[in-house]
A protein has these predicted regions:
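Conserved beta-strand position immediately N-terminal to the Walker
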Residues: 41
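A short, basic N-terminal segment
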Residues: 1-38
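P-loop NTPase nucleotide-binding core
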Residues: 44-49, 53-161, 167-168, 173
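Conserved catalytic network of the ASCE P-loop NTPase/AAA+ motor domain
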Residues: 34, 150-153, 183-186
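Charged helix-capping and loop-helix junction motifs
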Residues: 175-178
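Sensor-1/coupling segment of RecA-like P-loop NTPase cores
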Residues: 166, 170-171, 181-189
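Single conserved hydrophobic/aromatic residue that forms the stacking wall/gate
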Residues: 188-197
């Protein structure tokens, strides 16, 4: 991978690399201790404090990359359970693209409700995600399939949900309880959530 040239050593707005991540060792170690021990974590702070960068930094640690599958889903722009299910499905699908084809085939087998929008190019074999939010007829079923798929992975999965407070705005009620049920039911999964106040 090409090394990124950064002219300002005080990067704000996105994660670049360990080299440019300002000394958050305590927070990184605390997060590691919680996640490695299977605890679901809630991070709450005002905006622009670096919560998402901390998660990205944590996900880029060698031991975490070697032992876990990691997913970061920003739900700030969502307004429904269907949009949440769409973003979760898309995040997982896109992370599978570079993996061997058997992972993609397993994804299609488990994710029956998304199968219509996830296709393989007949010539190249490359996967594509051509699904729209409106294609998700039953978001509850899709969420169940997503978490079933993650529970079958050969490594523990960490799904960080950014701007988690957004679910309070959904028309559907008890979304937090539904996600909590998945977090508790699937021992192969950790759901750190990040909220801005």
């Amino acid at each position: 991978m090409n090394k990124l040239s950064v002219y300002n050593p005080f990067v704000v707005g996105h994660y670049v690399s360990d080299e440019y991540f300002c000394d958050r060792r305590q927070e990184t170690d605390f997060l590691r201790k919680q996640i490695v021990n299977g605890r679901n974590v809630v991070m709450i702070s005002p905006r622009r404090i670096g919560k998402s960068d901390l998660i990205h930094h944590f996900f880029h640690q060698e031991d975490i990359r070697a032992q876990y599958y990691t997913f970061f889903v920003d739900i700030y722009a969502t307004s429904s359970l269907a949009e949440l299910a769409y973003l979760l499905g898309k995040s997982i699908f896109l992370s599978l693209k570079p993996r061997p084809r058997k992972w993609m085939e397993h994804f299609f087998q488990v994710m029956k409700s998304l199968r219509v929008g996830c296709t393989l190019d007949s010539m190249s074999g490359d996967p594509s995600f051509n699904l729209q939010v409106g294609d998700i007829a039953s978001p509850e079923v899709t969420l169940h399939e997503i978490f079933d798929y993650l529970s079958q992975a050969d490594r523990h999965c960490i799904v960080a949900i950014y701007e988690f407070q957004q679910i309070a705005e959904y028309q559907e009620k008890n979304v937090e309880a539904v996600l909590r049920t998945y977090a508790v039911s699937y021992t192969h999964l950790t759901l750190p959530t990040i909220c801005s106040v």
